[in-house]
């Protein structure tokens, strides 16, 4: 074993962090893995079952879950490894970014990968996954553009019509934007459309 490999292994064993991640394969996982995690009384997020992932050759990967465990204080690699061994999961790694990892669980930022659904995540211990998945500024602008195009295509002249549509058909993207921070610009756009059609 080379000196570099030994150093890397030692560094991993000596690492400490609050947020850790690992992969769990259902075919080899402990039967009661979810109950085991719940009994730890920690915050965690389990991805939807990744059953549509492909490798670079286009072959299907083995079904798996990405799991993020979160602690209030630092935990060592050895402490987390006890958990992954109990679950029969992969070796743990420190999560570089909680937000980035949760977005990756759904493949939100990779247009070439299958998109998994937020509703299929398992969230435990009060994790605010909606906050972690909050739209970026670029995402918001794209959705506002979508709404404006929809307003023009449908000839919408009342804000209520758009809100009703968003509530029924675009609850996960348009509706939160309209409720939280984009209503003013959209209302002004609809109002100007109405004045234009009245002339």
Swiss-Prot record:
Q: Which GO terms describe its biological process?
A: DNA replication
What does it do? Is essential for plasmid replication. Nicks the positive strand at the plus origin of replication.
Q: Which domain of life is it from?
A: Bacteria
UniProt keyword list: DNA replication, Plasmid
Q: One GO cellular component from the entry?
A: extrachromosomal circular DNA
User: GO molecular function, one example?
Assistant: DNA binding
Q: Where are the transmembrane segments?
A: none
* Leader sequence residues: none
Give any Pfam family that matches. Rep_OBD
Designated name of the protein: Replication protein
Q: Of which family is this protein a member?
A: Belongs to the Gram-positive plasmids replication protein type 2 family.
């Amino acid at each position: 074993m080379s000196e570099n490999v030994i150093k890397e292994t030692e560094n991993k064993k000596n690492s400490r962090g609050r947020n850790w991640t690992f992969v769990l394969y259902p075919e080899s996982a402990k039967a009661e893995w979810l109950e085991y995690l719940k009994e730890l009384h920690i915050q965690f997020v389990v991805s939807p079952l990744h059953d549509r992932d492909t490798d670079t050759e286009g072959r299907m990967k083995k079904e798996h879950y990405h799991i993020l465990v979160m602690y209030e204080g630092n935990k060592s690699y050895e402490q987390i490894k006890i958990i992954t061994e109990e679950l029969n999961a992969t070796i743990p790694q420190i999560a570089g970014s909680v937000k980035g990892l949760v977005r990756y669980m759904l493949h939100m930022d990779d247009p070439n990968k299958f998109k998994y659904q937020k509703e299929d995540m398992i969230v435990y211990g009060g994790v605010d996954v909606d906050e972690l998945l909050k739209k970026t500024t670029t995402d918001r602008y794209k959705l506002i553009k979508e709404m404006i195009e929809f307003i023009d295509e449908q000839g919408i002249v009342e804000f209520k019509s758009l809100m009703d549509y968003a509530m029924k058909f675009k609850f996960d993207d348009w509706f939160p934007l309209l409720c939280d921070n984009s209503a003013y610009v959209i209302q002004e756009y609809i109002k100007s459309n109405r004045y234009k059609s009245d002339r």
